[in-house]
Amino acid sequence: MHWRIPRCVLSIVVGAVALFPAVSAAKRGNELFLSNPLTLRWQYTSDQTSNFTPATDTTTVYVPLADGTLVALDAGDGRLRWKAEAGGDFSAAPAVDERAVYVATQYAGADKNTMRGTLRALSKDTGITLWMRTLSAPLRGSLAVDGAGVFAGAASGNSYAFDKLTGRTLWVNQYADEFDGQPTVAGGRVYFGTVGGWLLALDQSNGNLMWRYRTRGAIRGPIAVANDSVFFGSADGFVYACRELSGKHVWKHRTGAAVEAVVALNGGVLASSLDNYAYFLSRKKGAMLWRQLLPGRIPARPVTASDGALFMPLSTDSAIVLSLKNGKPLNTLQLGEENNSSAAPIVTSDRVVLTTAHAVMAFAASR
């Protein structure tokens, strides 16, 4: 792989945010236990659901539809608050903060042979466009938002930081590899996985490359940072751990197929693999604590709580909760149809929200 020197446009200093705000089901003062009976509270029916994970600020769920529409649903009752045309097909999963929803789309260029991209900030209250940026290539995977910036990777090999108030480019780096993953912001760094198998740790303030680590498969899933270590999965079938500061290899653990997502928990590292198994590994050495076979491939990260983890296997009609202690099944949520969406489950204040082929469904504890 050939590396080009990063081209910094402008630098900023921004603070780190909590990792995976939508992954944990444990909420302050209102903890949701996944092993308890959960019932369907609302359902938004649509034949246009997509594989992109919705964004949430705990009170509203922002769902990107396949026809280029973003719908804002009340997290409590599923009521439609607003909908907005995004100006093209979605090319990445959205992100949300206290002010805006950030969406990436793609459209055909003037010659019809190339795809171009846009990045928009939409008002959370109305869906009105606050600003828009046009790009030479679509953004891919997912967007990540922090105190002052929006971070994303493009199909062209560009990694970006944008000012989230204006859309102005803060920095951009050009690499000879394609991005199609889920960037993570932690500890003053932004972590990007590439299709060519590289994990890049970039300085959050200016985009400078701090270190890189190579695997033998695409890195498309989320990256977890905890206790001075970085955990991630690769399409080469391994779960990896390396040092946060240096990128030095710590351990790797083989699974039977591509690893689509990892989550770092107090008791270990939870990994989802396309071999139909969920793996729970020790954080220190990567030793397998347990693994559990599920009835379908696991394409996305699970939702976790203190008592378990909820997975959305493909080609099944249910979501399954496994115990974090031993991997045994604890609960099942019936979806009413075979699931073929790779959108990850998310959590609002007290609800688990799931995307299926024809609906967005919210489950909560039985009253």
Regions found by a protein language model. Name each.
Residues 46-69, 90-120, 133-160, 173-200, ...:
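Repeat-blade elements of multi-bladed beta-propeller folds
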Residues 74, 123, 163, 203, ...:
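Structural recognition of the beta-propeller blade-terminating site
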Residues 9-19:
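Bacterial N-terminal signal peptides
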